[in-house]
Curated annotation (Swiss-Prot):
SMART domains: KH, S1
Top-level taxon of the source organism: Archaea
Similarity-based family: Belongs to the RRP4 family.
A GO BP annotation: U4 snRNA 3'-end processing
Protein name: Exosome complex component Rrp4
Membrane-spanning ranges: none
Pfam families, sorted: ECR1_N_2, KH_1
Main location (coarse class): cytoplasm
Lineage per the UniProt record: Archaea, Nitrososphaerota, Nitrososphaeria, Nitrosopumilales, Nitrosopumilaceae
GO molecular function: poly(A) binding; RNA binding
Amino acid sequence: MADKRKYVIPGDVVTTGPFRPEQNTVLEGNKIISTTIGISEIYDDSVRVIPLTGKYIPKINDLVIGKVNSHTSLSWELDINSCYVGFLPAQDVFGRDFSAHADELATKLRTGDLVAARIANFDRTRDPLVSISDRDLGKIDSGVLMEISPSKVPRLIGKKGSMIQMIEEATDAAVTIGQNGWVVVSCESPEGLLKAKKAIQMVNEQAHVANLTDQVKEMLDKKGES
């Protein structure tokens, strides 16, 4: 069974002893050193580091969009676009009267369902707990899932929400943005949906461009194009 995972940066000693260095690690004397930012794993006699490039690192109170992977009798496991998985306790959904014997989790959330949730607890040494107990959280019943780089999320939101507000007002779309880089777009109009998706993709691909807001606005203002 694998040892507990831990967050490492280049130069960190992952472990010492008779282990075989594998992905993103090197052997220096009897020390196995990480060569990248990532999560270390020790399995049997080998050591590796899973790189975090492009992946989301959870932070407490972050809003995330998760996809249900599976469930036990006590919780759901969510894919949150991270090297970590999110765990949603059944009691968070069923309430205080939840009974593992009487309540069936699949009646609330099934594999493949999307949920908007918040990171409730996380310390890098274990997978995070997520919660849907706040207002506007829970199962997402409609919309198209998009993925952008988590590092581009602040650009998509914009200063005081200016970018996403502009996109929503121009397309009549409703956009839910997860800090993990997953975005759900809902719109009754097919044209509005396509235009909103195009705007979001522009932000993802051109976040470094100085006049990006003007370019997105120009695209949104064009009639009959998507």
